[in-house]
């Protein structure tokens, strides 16, 4: 069972730790939980890792992986933790992905894989995470009927790909210095008529582009086109179209 939502999260961050969009007290998160059979763990982890990898590569980000292991205070048996950590390691190794061991930094209920994005000035930010959890299904007394007709305990994965969407947007803005690739630019084309007499034709072009699902704006201000063109450059719009 795979369940996901876009939800609001609140944290009591100390005022000195707050940092723009990167560290806030309330943020939006793409949260998902996957309930599975024990024998499905490795394939599900590999699937989630591949999903997050595809997302980050699409946006042009580099990242590194950290595998966080059992903390000093934890729930459950050590044998369960060892099995969980082994499954995470096996999934990463089968995918051929290098990772760093982060001893003792796992969640209290299970080990995790963290994705750390690198921004344009070399800082790293933890965004995506995959947490393997044997404990909460036990606490909530979850069960399924196996092939043998008996009750068994499922295993759960907590996962986020973007993590804090606000943080991800902040990293994205800094990474591209506002000059986004065409496919994610808020405005893809700006239309600049050179005088009022070309306004009607400029509006026809605007409508044609809008109908073609192009994010377009018409700058019809009665100023010199050189000024409108410089504004478009400052706004880092990928394409400016002069009409005249």
For each feature predicted by the language model, list its residue ranges:
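NTP/phosphate- and nucleic-acid-binding module
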Residues: 1-244
